């Protein structure tokens, strides 16, 4: 399937690191996923890769199509890298107050970055602009990270089982799961997997 299978080797299967500490004199252990080892150094690579792969499988992303997405940072970096590897033009719409380094990295990955001011609606304006671009350029794919069910599914069927299998190698199961929240895909997807079968696992965003 084009070069998507080659990219798969660069996303996921990151190490699970054991962190030992004590609390109130009692030994405790935390386990941290080292997501820096993903393709662009972010957990967002998982979601971006899965959304694009599923779009190709469903015929929604055709050869020569433009990938356009509204993002504030890491997802845009992931889409820029994966899109370029697959030979797609990538247009990223993002608020103009995001860091210079993020914008420059996307440029270096070959993406076009469209800055959106507060007067233009900021992030909500960026989302609207991707829709307007699609209306004018039909051969465009919008990942729609905020309302695409593939976002959560990526973590429910891939990240969650990966974490569970790695914990099993330490001889433990999860009592709780903590993740940062952007779109909510990571915490929702992994949480669903870890809680399947009515297991009592605390999930904290």
Model feature map: region roles:
Residues 1-205:
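PLP-dependent amino-acid enzyme catalytic core
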